[in-house]
């Protein structure tokens, strides 16, 4: 039987016999870890050896267990390994010798509490820290964006937000497990939430040539504004006061506007876009350096200036290659006190990593759970992490970070534990040819399934692979853009009960729908086979894919049956009033019957808000969907008086639940303009620029305006 250990130790040598009896840990220095009882039959003995070649070693014989470690954290790592063995074997441990050491010293995950603003749930974060300790993590990055309780911005708070007391308590808890909490804020881009309030309108960047700042919107702060610099200085002072971490991550990624306003434009003309950006972060770095902190910054805006990298290829219109030498002088100033976080979520990124290696810059390679693009996690993301981290190791990265993003519409970080754990396993073990040096991805998945949920078979893995892998039988029938997040959005984001049919019907024609229905039945069967050995109040989130697909099968089936009856009614309308009315009655009844199919989705959405602190919009949208189902049924019944020819479902989807936008007119719009007030609709044009080139004649020639 394989040892289900995550991460897998460097060497495990099995011995003869078993150690029988309940282990206990008498030393109070480690009682706070809550890994072992303080009383039992067999005492866990440990000793320190600062000259030990590895981080720790464990010896289990028929007579007892002994641990040797370099320091306290080494003993903790050994105890977490021993804890996992006891979880698997109980009070009959097989004899063995374990020697272990980490490949990388910076082993991190990021949890996103900003971006749609997740309420703080103390119990979940306590479990998070414990799980991270079991996986031998060193750093927890908390991504606040601007959703942080700044004392300097007392007006900018929200209910449910982490308080400073919450943060202090979490830092203290993490410290007992030798985990450093790193704050992640944004001091330039990704400030759209902050800038959506009129009180902050003067803080934004804008394009002087194309925008009026009184009416324009930007998600970027102005780099030269005195108000911005004073605010950012106060923010950084507060963060430095509260967090012991030697790294403060200040964002800096995906900046939509830089150097376009009157304050910034002169410097952009002289130094270029990159120069304005780098000079601003030179200022930020100076603030942090004064406080003895290192600046963490996302790497994409810096990498734009490198012609070989992917960011340059995508955004070369923003680059100033002629100013590369000048830009690099500032980068070199930042060298000793800055860590560049090089993010890429789809696999290898050798070119960007070579940029940092070539210039002697400190960098951390960042992958992602990728769950924000999915309905269920793809277990194959472990291969993408491996591809990124293996070249990062080769090129001297400080370590690795697996990120979690955008927790909303039924998604929470809890759903991303497999890719979070696989990233930490790769960090500890180091990268082998295909996955970790010490085990394959399949071996990791089986071990983590057991350690996280007590599941000894492959039932959970089979369910998640079927639900989330892009090439699975369940998803491969749909085009890529409709396989991931789109499924989740169809249930928890759209409120139009016809949208799924409009988008997915090309791929569900004929027998294709029955095939999809059978695949969803298989998904249900796979979920039913999951043998959860212990109660876990958070496990329910793994059911999201099944809940979504079941609801969508029912939706498509009932809408399609209703459309069949509606079509019969349309054909009978000119000559058979009885058949006409009957068809509409049956169609409306079928549509209304879909309401009960959304009960489980509604319960799931409410539970996510209660347990994980997710925003409540999925509940609100589902409530509106239920109303729109009634609205659709009522509208169909209102047509029984024959006051107009029946519009197609496509036109109903367009007019009944939203306002169509069109440059001139929307086909069929005249009937909707004369409808009953409950259903009256008309198209609009909120972007009244010409739909085609304009030309007019002068006395001598035609002048064409593009």
Predicted features along the sequence, with ranges:
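Feature activates predominantly on carbohydrate-active enzymes
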Residues: 2-11, 52-57, 61-296, 364-367, ...
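Short, well-ordered secondary-structure micro-motifs within conserved domains or adaptor modules
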Residues: 21-68
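A short acidic, often aromatic-flanked loop/helix-cap motif at beta-alpha or helix-coil junctions
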Residues: 50-51, 117, 348, 373
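Structural motif
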Residues: 42-43, 64-66, 107, 338-339, ...
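Substrate-binding groove of N-acetylhexosamine-processing glycoside hydrolases
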Residues: 2-35, 169-172, 178, 226-237, ...
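Short secondary-structure boundary segments
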Residues: 48, 144, 404
């Amino acid at each position: 039987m394989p040892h289900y250990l995550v991460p897998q130790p460097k060497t495990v040598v099995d011995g003869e016999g078993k150690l029988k009896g309940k282990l206990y840990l008498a030393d109070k220095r480690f009682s706070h870890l809550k890994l072992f009882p303080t009383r039992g039959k067999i005492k866990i003995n440990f000793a320190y050896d600062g000259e030990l070649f590895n981080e720790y070693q464990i010896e289990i014989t028929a007579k007892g267990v002994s641990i040797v470690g370099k320091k306290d954290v080494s003993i903790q790592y050994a105890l977490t390994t021993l804890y996992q063995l006891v979880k698997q074997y109980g009070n009959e441990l097989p004899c063995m010798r374990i020697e272990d050491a980490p490949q990388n010293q910076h082993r991190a995950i990021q949890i996103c509490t900003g971006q749609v603003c997740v309420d703080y749930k103390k119990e979940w974060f306590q479990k998070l820290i414990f799980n991270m300790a079991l996986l031998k993590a060193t750093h927890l990055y908390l991504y606040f964006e601007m959703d942080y309780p700044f004392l300097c911005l007392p007006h900018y708070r929200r209910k449910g937000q982490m308080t400073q007391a919450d943060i202090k308590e979490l830092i203290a808890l993490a410290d007992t497990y030798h985990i450093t909490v790193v704050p992640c804020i944004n001091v330039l881009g990704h400030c759209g939430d902050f800038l959506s309030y009129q009180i902050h309108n003067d803080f934004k960047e804008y394009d002087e040539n194309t925008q009026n700042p009184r009416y324009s919107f930007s998600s970027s702060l102005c780099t030269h504004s005195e108000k911005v610099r004073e605010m950012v200085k106060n923010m950084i002072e507060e963060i430095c006061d509260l967090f012991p971490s030697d790294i403060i991550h200040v964002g800096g990624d995906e900046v939509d506007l830089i150097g376009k306003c009157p304050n910034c434009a002169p410097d952009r003309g002289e130094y270029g876009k990159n120069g304005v950006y780098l000079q601003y972060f030179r200022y930020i770095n100076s603030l942090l350096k004064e406080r003895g902190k290192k600046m963490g910054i996302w790497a994409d805006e810096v990498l734009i200036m490198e012609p070989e990298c992917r960011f340059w290829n995508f955004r070369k219109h923003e680059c100033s290659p002629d100013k590369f030498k000048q830009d690099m002088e500032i980068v070199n100033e930042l060298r000793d006190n800055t860590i560049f976080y090089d993010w890429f979520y789809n696999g290898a990124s050798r070119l960007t990593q070579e940029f940092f290696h070539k210039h002697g810059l400190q960098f951390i390679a960042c992958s992602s759970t990728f769950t924000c693009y999915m309905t269920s996690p793809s277990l194959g993301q472990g291969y993408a992490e491996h591809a990124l981290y293996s070249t990062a190791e080769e090129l001297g990265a400080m370590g690795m970070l697996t990120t979690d993003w955008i927790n909303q519409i039924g998604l929470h970080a809890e759903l991303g534990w497999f890719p979070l754990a696989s990233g930490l396993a790769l960090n500890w073990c180091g990268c082998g040819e295909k996955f970790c040096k010490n085990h394959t991805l399949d071996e990791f998945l089986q071990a983590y399934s057991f350690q996280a949920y007590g599941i000894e078979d492959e039932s959970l893995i089979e369910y998640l692979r079927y639900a989330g892998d892009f090439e699975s039988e369940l998803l491969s029938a749909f085009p890529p853009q409709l396989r991931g997040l789109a499924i989740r959005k169809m249930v928890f984001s759209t409120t139009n009960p016809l949208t799924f049919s409009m988008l997915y019907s090309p791929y569900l024609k004929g027998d294709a729908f029955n095939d999809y229905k059978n695949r969803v039945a298989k998904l249900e069967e796979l979920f039913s086979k999951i043998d959860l050995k212990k109660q876990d109040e958070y496990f329910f989130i793994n059911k999201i894919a099944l809940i979504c697909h079941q609801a969508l099968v029912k939706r498509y089936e009932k809408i399609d049956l209703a459309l069949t009856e509606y079509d019969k009614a349309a054909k009978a309308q000119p000559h058979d009033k009885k058949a006409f009315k009957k068809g509409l009655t049956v169609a409306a009844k079928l549509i209304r019957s879909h309401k009960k199919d959304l009960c489980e989705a509604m319960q799931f959405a409410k539970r996510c808000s209660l347990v994980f602190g997710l925003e409540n919009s999925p509940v609100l949208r589902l409530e509106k969907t239920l109303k729109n189902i009634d609205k659709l049924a009522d509208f169909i019944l209102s047509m029984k008086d024959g006051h107009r020819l029946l519009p197609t479902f496509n036109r109903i989807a367009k007019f009944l639940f939203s306002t169509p936008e069109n440059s001139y007119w929307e086909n069929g719009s005249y009937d909707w303009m004369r409808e009953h007030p409950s259903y009256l609709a008309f198209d609009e044009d909120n972007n009244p620029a010409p739909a085609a080139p304009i030309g007019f004649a002068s006395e001598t020639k035609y002048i064409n305006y593009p």
